[in-house]
Amino acid sequence: MVKIKSNLKQLKLSVPAQESPISSFLTASGTFHDGDFLLNQKGLRLTSDEKQSRQSDSKELDFEITAEDLETVKVIGKGSGGVVQLVRHKWVGKFFAMKVIQMNIQEEIRKQIVQELKINQASSQCPHVVVCYHSFYHNGAFSLVLEYMDRGSLADVIRQVKTILEPYLAVVCKQVLLGLVYLHNERHVIHRDIKPSNLLVNHKGEVKISDFGVSASLASSMGQRDTFVGTYNYMSPERISGSTYDYSSDIWSLGMSVLECAIGRFPYLESEDQQNPPSFYELLAAIVENPPPTAPSDQFSPEFCSFVSACIQKDPPARASSLDLLSHPFIKKFEDKDIDLGILVGTLEPPVNYLR
C-alpha cells in the first residue's frame, strides 16, 4: 500500500478567473484572434512571425487540406478539450488524426489549445514530435489535422504486452529524448505532460511526443515556471508542491513513464493498490514525501536502473538533462544492436480496432 509520511501542505490550486466569452475573440469575418494568434478556415497565422507566413499550405504534403476534404472514420479519443477523430482525405485516401475542440469551454482550456497550436506551428519540423499538418477555425471549433500514429500510444502498447523489454525501451527512450532535446534546447518549451498516453507510436516503430495543450514556452533555457497543470500522476514533486520548475520536470515524468512501461504498473502503486488505489491527495502526498521509486535491481540491468535513477531524483538539479541522457550507458548499450521497435508494435492490434 502507498504509505505517506506527512500531509501534503502545499498545493497551488487556483480559483478560475472571470472568463471572456468566445465572441470577444472573433473578428467581424469570423477569424479567431487572440494576441498575435489568428486562425480561420484558411489556416493559422502568427503576427509575431517575422515572415508573417500563413499556414495555408499543408506541411510536408504534396496536396492541400481543407475541412471539406476530410471525412470522419471514427472517434479514437476523448478528453477535456474535445475529441480526436480518425479522418481520411477523400481524394488522396491518406489518414490523419484530427483533434476537434469546441470553443464553448473554459477559458483556461481555450488558452491551452491556443498554446498547443503555437507550439505545433513551430515544432513540426522535428521528426520526434507529432506533425501538425494543418489547423483551422470553423463553426465554433478549432481543428488540428495531425499525423496519424497507427499503433496508438505507449499506454496502448503496455495494455497489450503488459511490460516492455529493455532493448525496446532503450529505442523508445532515445527517440523521446531526441524530441525533448529539441523542445528544451531549441524551442525552449517545457512539455509538462509527458506520460505513456502522450508518447505515440506507429507501425514503423517511430515514437513521437504529442499533446502540447499544457506546454509552457520560456523566454530562455534557464527560465522557470510555477503553475500547476498537467497529469498529476506523472508530475515532479516540485510541481505538486507549488515550487518553481524547469525542463527537469519533464525528465522526472519521462523516468516515471519508462519505469511504468518496464514494470507494468504505475511506479508509486504496489500490486495490492491496483484494486484499491489511493486517493488523489494520498498519491500527491506520496510523490512529494516518500522516497522516489526505483527499478528493481534483481529484475533489470544496472544500466537501466541507473537510467531510471538519473531521471527520478527528488532534487531537480540532480536529474540528468535530456542531452546528457542521450549518452547514458543504457542508451548506448543497445545502439549497435539494430533493435527494431516495429517488430514489437507490428504484432499488436491497432487501438483503432478496439476503440468504439
From Swiss-Prot:
CDD domains: PKc_MAPKK_plant_like. Activated through serine and threonine phosphorylation. Keywords: ATP-binding, Cytoplasm, Cytoskeleton, Kinase, Nucleotide-binding, Phosphoprotein, Serine/threonine-protein kinase, Transferase. The keyword Iron does not apply. One of its GO terms (biological process) is defense response to oomycetes. It comes from Arabidopsis thaliana. The modification Phosphoserine is found at S221. ATP binds at I76, G77, K78, G79, S80, G81, G82, V83, V84, K99. The ANPs-MKK6-MPK4 module is involved in the regulation of plant cytokinesis during meiosis and mitosis. MKK6-MPK13 module positively regulates lateral root formation. Phosphorylates and activates MPK4. Activates MPK5 and MPK13 in vitro. One of its GO terms (molecular function) is MAP kinase kinase activity. Residues 70-331 form the Protein kinase domain. The modification Phosphothreonine is found at T231. SMART domains: S_TKc (SM00220). InterPro entries: Kinase-like_dom_sf (IPR011009), Prot_kinase_dom (IPR000719), Protein_kinase_ATP_BS (IPR017441), Ser/Thr_kinase_AS (IPR008271). It comes from the Eukaryota. Disruption phenotype: Plants exhibit a dwarf phenotype with fewer flowers, large cells with multiple nuclei in various organs and large malformed pollen grains. Defects in the formation of the cell plate. RNAi MKK6 displays fewer lateral roots. The keyword Nucleotide-binding applies. GO terms for cellular component: cytoskeleton; phragmoplast. Expressed in roots, stems and flower buds. Higher levels in shoot apices and flowers. This is Mitogen-activated protein kinase kinase 6. Interacts with P.syringae type III effector HopF2. Interacts with MPK4, MPK6, MPK11 and MPK13. Interacts with ANP3. It holds the Pfam family Pkinase.
